[in-house]
Structure formats: structure tokens, C-alpha cells
């Protein structure tokens, strides 16, 4: 995202008013169907009609027809979700007092040609929480010198700015949690917090309008920060913008308004729809602040599902669990099945689970002793197969609040747990099969025990009918919420795949294990078993291996 000069006003304010009568499932259908058409050109999708250049156009229904579920299902374009009066027009510029002008010329045509709604309509609120007033906020007027001069913002503390995304506002559950954790910080990290509430401009179902509105909201925040800098002497080097979804991109526009001088931007799963593949001028990127860290938790997956952006957008980009769906949230198959099966509202909520996990991770990282260690790697598969388990000279990184102190840069991978506390200590298990073993298929599990307590149960094959061959080396990375300490033994279980209609019945009924290693990635401790012997694990049975704290190869 780079700075852009705006032309003078040439068109009137185009502010839609619309009844909020569409439920969440309709938006999910609209977004998913739009992606189907853009990516797969599936002509059977009913809600959208795309023109040759890929821009949304009105359908056979008049744009000023009353908006109802019936008219949508009959074939209205997503553009109907934007305004009841008329479709947006190309080459439009709107200007407002204080914030200036905005046009929808390329590349700012990424919001379906929408331009920002007026400041009066969006009604952005700025709530200041300080160390002295942690629950009773001051309301600051962003364009009032008097309001800013009379505010209680400290000149010595960090100023953290929180910007929410679509269909959120200051009452959204995660915002008070994040604010509270930030206000607990001590010493050099001690902070004041400004919560930016632009909920009126982020309301369902007007997603394209919300995409356009973040340009105006970001500029408003930037103007506030400039006045705090000029009037109160607060350094840009002590300003940190934290944004979720659309709010992450709004942080980029905020920093643009102060010539990209912000110390830091933390993007929590920056929004993907209308931003993926677009020029950096319209979305968050690493040039927007001195340090930009990004957590990707719901990147685009099969059939266009996914609310977050896939591209690297920061100095460090974290992809926990691969960045697509998160443990404890529905799988890719469940999401696709929900949409194709007509359960689109459930699918939207399921997708939101992974999308929202990004702020869950960030909130937890602020005051947790668990390090959220992440490793540089080319892709998630390579990481899970144990190919990126050593921190290079350039360094690993710590996902979340403390990433700014990490040496590592670029793409980082880690695993998390399925429920809170999400952070876990990483362990790598490697199982080597004997070269004289008969070929078979099924699933192999390893259960890890300490003091006779089960700590983790890991599938090394990740599916029930995996081919298992002589000499295979099976590897897997998993996490546990505390340091395991001393590991006593593991139990290996082999579940052979069942024959189907006579197929698969000739395969071996056992596996032969010649080596097992368990490595702690945070402290590099290695446990080994079977250095010089082989053990047999019959189908549907378990074998116990005692572990020693050394590497068989040493």
C-alpha cells in the first residue's frame, strides 16, 4: 500500500440506506458464489451474474426493487446488496470535509465500484482506555484539537489502536479481551488503548461498502494519530495498530495517512475477498509500517472458501496449522459439504471460527509464558514432515505480540492446540519401518506418556487407509500445552485398513518398527527407542516402547 493523491470532487455523496433484512447465510452464499464464478465460472450458481471483465453487474431485477430473500434467490446480483437506488458508477469521486476525496478508479475498483460512505453515516467512534481508566473510556473527537489536547493519552506509553472488521463493533467479544490484555502490560510495553468503532459502516450485508469504507476509516484514524503526534508530542515510534480482517487493511490506510511512520501493524487474518491478488496500494503490505506482522488463520481453500488472504503481507507472516482451517474448527470437507448441502449459515459460522482464531492467538500471546515458536519453512507439508525443525542463523520467530523481537522474517509455520490455551510446545516424532516388512495399509498411532499419564495421541499417517511400505519413515509435528518434561514411554498402535468387497485382504497383518525418535523442538531434547532392535506391532494391537534421553545416531 502506497500513498495516493486524490482528485477534487466531481460527484455527489452516494450514501445508500438499506434495511438489514438479509441473514448471515445469504452473505455466505453471495461471497462463495461470487468466488465460484470468478474462479471456476460455475454457471449454475444463482445469485451472481458476472460481466466479461469480472465486474459485478445488476441482474435481470431492477436495482431499486425491494430487497428480500425471494428477490435474491430469484437471481439478483450481489450489487443489489449494496444499494436500493442504483448501481455504483465507474469514475466516481466523493469528497468529504476533513478527510478529503476518494475515487473508485483502478486500483480502487476492488469494492465493486463502491466509494466510502459519508463520515456521518459511518459515525466512527474513538474510545480511549488508559492505565488510570481501564473500563470507563474517554471519547475522543478525531478532528477536534480541544478534544485531543484534553485527552488523557500518555506521551510515555505505547499507544495501541484496535480496529475491528466486518459485522463487528466495539461490543464484539474479542475486543474487550484484547484491550484488557494490552492494559496488563508493564514496564516498556505499558500501553494506552484506542478502540476504533466503525460498526455502522461494517454492517451486514453490505460487504462491498465495508471494503470501501475502510479507506475513510483508516484516514480518520491517521488524522487522529497525526494530531496526537503534533499536539501532544506522542511519537509514531510508540504507535501500534492491531486490525482484524478488514481492520487489518484499515491499519494500512491509517499508516498511509501519516506517511507510513507507524512503528508497527499487526494484521490478524487480513480479509481476502476483494483483496486477494490486488495491488498492494489497496491492501496491507510490509511497506505500511516499520514492522508488520501477520497471522493467517483462514486463507482461501477449495471452492473459494476462506475469509482471509493467502499472500504474504508483512515482514513476518505466520501460518498456524497451515493457515487454512484451525484445530477445533470444522474441516475443509465439512465447510464444502455445508455450502453444497444448503447449510450455508452453518458454513459461515464454521468459517468464522478459523477466521476469528487469529485474534484468539494474538490475545493469548500477550501475557502467556508459552512462546508460540514458529519455524521458517517453504510450506506447511514440509514443516509437518519434519524438514524445517531447526532455527537457521536468520532465526525462528514468536507468533503474536512479541514477534517484533524475533530475528526471523518471511513465512513461518507452527502448530497449535484445538482449544484454549492454544499455544503448545512443539514435538517431532519419527518412526522408521523395517526394510523386511510386508506391505500393508491402515493407520499408525503413537501415544506419548509421562509419569504414566497420556500426554498426546498422534496419527502418523493421518488417514485410515494409508499405504504403509517397508522402509517408510513416518514423521509428524504436534504440540502440547506445557513442556512435556521427562517422557517415559510411547505406545504404538496399528489399525489395519479393512478389506472392501474383497480388496485389501492380502496385505500384511503387522508392522515392524526399527526406530522411533521423539524430539522437543523448543529445547532440542531427543528421546530414542529401538536403537538396535526391531519390534512387531500386530494389527489392532499396541506395543510399548521405553524411551531413553539420547539420539541413537550419536
Predicted features along the sequence, with ranges:
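Alpha/beta-hydrolase active-site loop signature
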Residues: 200-202, 272
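Glycine-rich nucleophile elbow surrounding the catalytic serine of serine-hydrolase chemistry
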Residues: 242-253
